[in-house]
């Protein structure tokens, strides 16, 4: 092991031992309850300072500012009172809910026992649905049953904010019944494998907050288990709603076990990667038997959603021959090579119903992968891309017949003027199943800055109705992202998702914006920092030029200085206008102006 790799691994080990870094000063962990207090939903509450008001008598008064609630994905890592032992894993939040429904049983022969080298202190029970019982959130929703997961989600999406009577009537308040209807219709999913009880329920659908996925995972030449667990914790602290483990290197199974047992968010995988490892890296040796065993192992382990490239058909492959960048999806290229070598139809497509049966036994959601997504803006919206999308729509109906939850994956590289067509066709072809896109990147000229190029596309497609955005880091096209890259990618995508929520008119999305704008106008610097998406960076930028604590009391920053601050001048104008005599005089002059037919009368 090289010295740099050893150093990275040791840094990750130290991070895991001391992961209590405070990313959000002046924030408290708050739990919101349902009516019988059987559910505790975590949110982050940002405490704000009072507003200083000078009345007409030149006396100082104070006005309280309510705390701002912020959606929190950090799970126990965001609660300073939590005692976490990585080798034991997180508490099983959903275990009682799952068992109380009385439709699961312990797995008699656990395939995961073949992988004993996981170093966990506790034996993990693994479940499967009882014979002739369906346990998916989609089945419950279609049956009119509101699950604890649905109730949890409704509280999480509302965060106890008050709604006006008209907003409540217009379905802006997200009730458990609203969640149930969205899941039942297929417009939303709640990824929740019964063998991942550590996860906190979340919903993916266009009528909810836009969600963010972070990709982590090792490669054959980089990273360790410790570094991937570090990235997991870092991801959820910075706001990842789900995490995909895309490991392609050594110890795939053990890496995933550590990630699952310590993850408060749903975990997705691309099973073909591990299946290829089982085939010794030789694509031609892949077959349905290997792939099925891989699915079962991951199902029993607790993976919440599978990305499978079932829509890439043999007859679509020639459509890519004139592309500038060919097939850029790793899973897609594997399937394409297998199909061409054997001159057979995609074995995932051929066995799709069997896959649905497996998923329904564990409540695993399917993320139908876009193996023919464009890898450059020149290839965007071509025949191959939309042929696959049309097939994914057909497969969606098949999965729904087995009560399996489905979302659809999308591009990729798409110029701004072609983005909306992707959303329009996805809704039409795929029956309004949630859309989950990688960006899209809107230009190909910025390696090292593709979190910007893709953030532009992500904000737009989120506005148009995309339910979840897969982040892109600065390392896209260049290398495996490290901890700092993960942070930068997540920040870019949290901004894009938030901008999309505002554009969609999500009722509570703008509360944070209004609070920070009010703090900015009132020169409450600490509140500005604490409400921002990255408080420590905002504070450090301010302190580069005004480092003293007294600088937090100034009514200006170093951009404009004390004499040219527009907000300071605006405040002075507002205070000046509060004088009743001035207002009366201005109103009087306004009436004179109107009587003179809107003409000025100048007296010498």
Swiss-Prot record:
UniProt pathway annotation:
Cofactor biosynthesis; thiamine diphosphate biosynthesis
Query: How is the cofactor bound, in the record's words?
Result: Binds 1 [4Fe-4S] cluster per subunit. The cluster is coordinated with 3 cysteines and an exchangeable S-adenosyl-L-methionine.
A Gene Ontology molecular function term for this protein is: carbon-carbon lyase activity
Q: Which cofactor does it need?
A: [4Fe-4S] cluster
What Gene3D superfamilies does the entry give? 6.10.250.620, Radical SAM ThiC family, central domain (3.20.20.540)
What broad class of enzyme is this? lyase
Q: Where along this sequence does the record place binding of [4Fe-4S] cluster? A: 557, 560, 565
Annotated substrate binding sites = 215, 244, 273, 309, 329-331, 370-373, 409, 436
Identify the residues that bind Zn(2+): 413, 477
Query: What Gene Ontology terms describe where this protein resides (cellular component)?
Result: cytosol
Does the entry feature the keyword 4Fe-4S, yes or no? yes
Q: Which domain of life is it from?
A: Bacteria
Q: Which reaction does it catalyse?
A: 5-amino-1-(5-phospho-beta-D-ribosyl)imidazole + S-adenosyl-L-methionine = 4-amino-2-methyl-5-(phosphooxymethyl)pyrimidine + CO + 5'-deoxyadenosine + formate + L-methionine + 3 H(+)
Q: Which GO terms describe its biological process?
A: thiamine biosynthetic process; thiamine diphosphate biosynthetic process
Q: What does the UniProt keyword field contain? A: 4Fe-4S, Iron, Iron-sulfur, Lyase, Metal-binding, S-adenosyl-L-methionine, Thiamine biosynthesis, Zinc
Q: Name one Pfam family in it.
A: ThiC_Rad_SAM
Task: Write out the similarity annotation.
Answer: Belongs to the ThiC family.
The protein's assembly and partners: Homodimer.
Outline what the protein does. Catalyzes the synthesis of the hydroxymethylpyrimidine phosphate (HMP-P) moiety of thiamine from aminoimidazole ribotide (AIR) in a radical S-adenosyl-L-methionine (SAM)-dependent reaction.
Protein name (Swiss-Prot/TrEMBL):
Phosphomethylpyrimidine synthase
| Encoding gene, per UniProt annotation | thiC
């Amino acid at each position: 092991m090289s010295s740099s790799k050893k150093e990275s691994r040791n840094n990750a080990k130290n991070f895991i031992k001391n992961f209590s870094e405070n990313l959000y000063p002046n924030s408290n962990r708050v739990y919101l309850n349902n009516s019988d207090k059987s559910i505790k939903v975590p949110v982050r509450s940002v405490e704000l300072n009072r507003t200083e008001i000078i009345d007409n008598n030149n006396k100082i008064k104070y006005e309280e500012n309510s705390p701002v609630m912020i959606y929190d994905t950090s799970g126990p890592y965001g609660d300073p009172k939590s005692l976490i032992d990585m080798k034991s894993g997180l508490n099983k939040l959903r275990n009682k809910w799952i068992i109380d429904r009385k439709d699961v049983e312990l797995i008699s022969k656990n395939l995961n026992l073949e992988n004993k080298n996981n170093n966990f202190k506790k034996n993990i029970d693994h479940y499967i649905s009882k014979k002739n019982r369906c346990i998916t959130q989609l089945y419950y929703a279609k049956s009119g049953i509101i699950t604890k997961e649905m109730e949890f989600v409704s509280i999480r999406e509302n965060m106890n904010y008050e709604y006006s009577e008209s907003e409540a009537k217009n379905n802006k308040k997200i009730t458990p019944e609203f969640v149930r209807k969205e899941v039942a219709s297929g417009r939303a999913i709640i990824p929740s494998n019964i063998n991942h009880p550590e996860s906190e329920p979340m919903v993916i659908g266009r009528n909810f907050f836009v969600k963010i996925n972070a990709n982590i995972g090792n490669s054959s030449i980089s990273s360790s288990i410790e570094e991937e667990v570090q990235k997991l914790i870092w991801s959820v602290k910075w706001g990842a709603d789900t995490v995909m483990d895309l490991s392609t290197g050594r110890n795939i199974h053990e890496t995933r076990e550590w990630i699952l047992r310590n993850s408060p968010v749903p975990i997705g995988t691309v099973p073909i990667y591990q299946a290829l490892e089982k085939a010794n890296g030789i694509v031609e040796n892949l077959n349905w038997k290997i792939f099925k065993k891989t699915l079962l192992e991951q199902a029993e382990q607790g993976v919440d959603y599978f990305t499978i490239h079932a829509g890439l058909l043999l007859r679509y492959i020639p459509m890519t021959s004139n592309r500038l960048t060919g097939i850029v999806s790793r899973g897609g290229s594997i399937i394409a090579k297998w199909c061409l070598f054997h001159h057979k139809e995609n074995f995932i497509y051929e066995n799709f119903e069997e896959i649905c049966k497996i998923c329904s036994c564990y409540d695993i959601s399917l993320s139908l992968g876009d193996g023919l997504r464009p890898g450059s803006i020149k290839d965007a919206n071509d025949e191959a891309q939309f042929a696959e999308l049309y097939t994914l729509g057909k497969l969606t109906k098949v999965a729904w017949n087995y009560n399996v939850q489905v979302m659809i994956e999308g591009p990729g590289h798409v110029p701004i003027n072609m983005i909306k067509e992707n959303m329009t066709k996805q809704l039409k072809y795929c029956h309004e199943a949630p859309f989950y896109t990688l960006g899209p990147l809107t230009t190909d000229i910025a390696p090292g800055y593709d979190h910007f190029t893709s953030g532009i596309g992500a904000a737009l497609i989120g506005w148009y109705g995309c339910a979840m955005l897969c982040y892109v880091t600065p390392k896209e096209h260049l290398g495996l992202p490290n901890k700092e890259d993960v942070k930068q990618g997540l920040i870019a995508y949290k901004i894009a998702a938030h901008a999309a929520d505002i554009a969609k008119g999500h009722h509570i999305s703008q509360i944070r914006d209004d609070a920070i704008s009010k703090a900015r106008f009132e020169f409450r610097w600490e509140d500005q920092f604490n409400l921002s998406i990255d408080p420590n960076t905002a504070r450090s930028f301010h302190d580069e030029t005004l480092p003293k604590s007294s600088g937090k009391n100034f009514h200006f920053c170093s951009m404009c200085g004390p004499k040219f601050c527009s907000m300071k001048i605006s405040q002075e104008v507002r205070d000046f206008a509060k004088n009743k005599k001035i207002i009366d005089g201005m109103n009087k002059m306004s009436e004179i102006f109107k009587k003179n037919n809107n003409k000025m009368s100048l007296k010498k």
